[in-house]
Amino acid sequence: NLYQFKNMIHCTVPSRPWWHFADYGCYCGRGGKGTAVDDLDRCCQVHDNCYGEAEKLGCWPYLTLYKYECSQGKLTCSGGNNKCEAAVCNCDLVAANCFAGAPYIDANYNVNLKERCQ
């Protein structure tokens, strides 16, 4: 769920508050359209699409609780997760790892969605 996703982000990017990723570019945050502004925004676009695929399986990605571990910045989804838990956990894990590898460009925080994301 979103709370667990926030904690995963803190695991892989402890130096930056999670809310910096909640309003970034065209895809980090609620909804998303247009062309991603950079690599970090593309991480969010992929995450949005991953949640969409989980929904097609009948899952509720924003609410699904799953089991995972964070150890020294490394995330692992539990093998004991059911189909939906595993799908959502993997979406969040891939995104959190992607965030860790993408540069954060301050100018792309809180962009004007109407101007930049058509």
UniProtKB/Swiss-Prot annotation:
Name the reaction it catalyses: a 1,2-diacyl-sn-glycero-3-phosphocholine + H2O = a 1-acyl-sn-glycero-3-phosphocholine + a fatty acid + H(+)
Q: Which Gene3D superfamilies match?
A: Phospholipase A2 domain
Q: Which InterPro entries match?
A: PLipase_A2, PLipase_A2_Asp_AS, PLipase_A2_dom, PLipase_A2_dom_sf, PLipase_A2_His_AS
Keyword check for rRNA-binding, yes or no. no
Q: What is its EC number?
A: 3.1.1.4
* Residues involved in Ca(2+) binding: 27, 29, 31, 48
Q: Which Gene Ontology molecular-function terms are recorded?
A: calcium ion binding; calcium-dependent phospholipase A2 activity; phospholipid binding; toxin activity
Q: Which domain of life is it from?
A: Eukaryota
- Which residues does the entry assign to the active site, renumbered to this chain? 47, 92
Single GO BP term: phospholipid metabolic process
Q: Which PANTHER family match?
A: PHOSPHOLIPASE A2, PHOSPHOLIPASE A2 FAMILY MEMBER
Q: What does this protein do?
A: Snake venom phospholipase A2 (PLA2) that causes myonecrosis when injected intramuscularly, shows indirect hemolytic activity, abolishes twitches evoked by indirect stimulation earlier than those by direct stimulation (in the mouse phrenic nerve-diaphragm preparation) but does not produce complete neuromuscular block (up to 30 ug/ml) (in the chick biventer cervicis nerve-muscle preparation). PLA2 catalyzes the calcium-dependent hydrolysis of the 2-acyl groups in 3-sn-phosphoglycerides.
What name goes with this protein?
A: Acidic phospholipase A2 CM-I
